[in-house]
Amino acid sequence: MAKEQFDRSLPHVNIGTIGHVDHGKTTLTAAITKVLSEQGNAEFKDYANIDNAPEERERGITINTAHVEYKTANRHYAHVDCPGHADYVKNMITGAAQMDGAILVVAATDGPMPQTREHILLSRQVGVPKIVVFLNKCDMVEDDEMIDLVEMEIRDLLTEYDFDGEGAPVIRGSALGALNGDSKWTGAINELMAAVDEYIPTPQRDADKTFLMPVEDVFTITGRGTVATGRVERGTVKVNEEVEIIGLKEEPTKTVVTGLEMFRKLLDFAVAGDNVGALLRGVDRHSVERGQVLAKPGTIKPHTVLKASVYALTQEEGGRHKPFFNKYRPQFYFRTTDVTGEVTLPEGTDMVMPGDNVEMEIQLIKPVAVEEGTKFSIREGGRTIGAGTVISIEK
């Protein structure tokens, strides 16, 4: 069967369902595909199909995630739904599923529960910009005032974690009712998708961001100079543009890209996703190395102290068998290199057990080009024992 051409005419947005266990995330995901499939904009996926999510491995961590896709009149969506709470923690911290926005599912029968709060906090830590709320199971609550109270609680909770509690759309519905074809509740799904379309911003495409390329390898072309190779992470770089070499040293080095090539062909410019070699003017073989980045001047700095949200792998995932403690010194793997760092655990946390999610401060022995949202792995003796996301830069 011939593969269908991917439609690029609609902007693409990644979203996901988050919320407490059994509040109806997976049922809602199924209901969205059902309602949109009747408009020709999705393929219906039933609950069982989504719930039996295949195991994926991302940076050595086993995550169960279901991916569905659908579209509205305005956008194409990739939607991720995870069966278990631990899967969300891992998914969001490793960036396995980058979310441009989230649908927070809260059962009107229960109101906000512990994982509701945890998922909102996680969304804040990993930089999910906007959250739309779906109040589920409204068909099981007789009293509208009860639902009003739940809505107020959720708005307060969003505000507490620096989301737009006042302005966030809150849609009342019943995912099960919509799955069963009840027109009152299929209407709520359409209302939800309209809110997602309008409220969740279209992400800036990687190509439109400022240029950054992690250096993977360096070699010399006799008579021409030094070439740094790597995959452009974001932005665009043109021949004869000035860039900075950043990381592993206190100060960046300025240089000019005098040539670009990909697959042995010369390029005028390189864009996010391209694997390229960049010829650098006046740079000797030893002043650029793997683990540094090339970037647009002034856009990213090298840092040594950062706060991060970290997930410690379980023993089954190949992680440690025992906990680690304050002042633990593993290797932190950023983009293309390992740098040793020392962990400071928050007050009141004596140790981190395999399977824990914890916020910590990290002091690196060499400066690395990082910013809020940068993902990394934690390694010990060459094996991955954790994964993290930078929450803030301290120094």
Curated annotation (Swiss-Prot):
Residues 19-26 are annotated as: G1. CDD domains: EF_Tu, EFTU_II, EFTU_III. The lineage of its organism: Bacteria, Bacillati, Mycoplasmatota, Mollicutes, Mycoplasmataceae. This is Elongation factor Tu. It comes from Mycoplasma mycoides subsp. mycoides SC (strain CCUG 32753 / NCTC 10114 / PG1). Keywords: Cytoplasm, Elongation factor, GTP-binding, Hydrolase, Magnesium, Metal-binding, Nucleotide-binding, Protein biosynthesis. GO terms for cellular component: cytosol. Residues 81-84 are annotated as: G3. Residues 136-139 are annotated as: G4. Residues 174-176 are annotated as: G5. It is an enzyme of class 3 (hydrolase). Residues 10-204 form the tr-type G domain. Its EC number is 3.6.5.3. The gene is tuf. Residues 60-64 are annotated as: G2. It is found in: Cytoplasm. Belongs to the TRAFAC class translation factor GTPase superfamily. Classic translation factor GTPase family. EF-Tu/EF-1A subfamily. Mg(2+) binds at T26. GTP binds at residues 19-26, 81-85, 136-139. GTP hydrolase that promotes the GTP-dependent binding of aminoacyl-tRNA to the A-site of ribosomes during protein biosynthesis. Monomer. GO terms for molecular function: GTP binding; GTPase activity; translation elongation factor activity. It catalyses: GTP + H2O = GDP + phosphate + H(+).
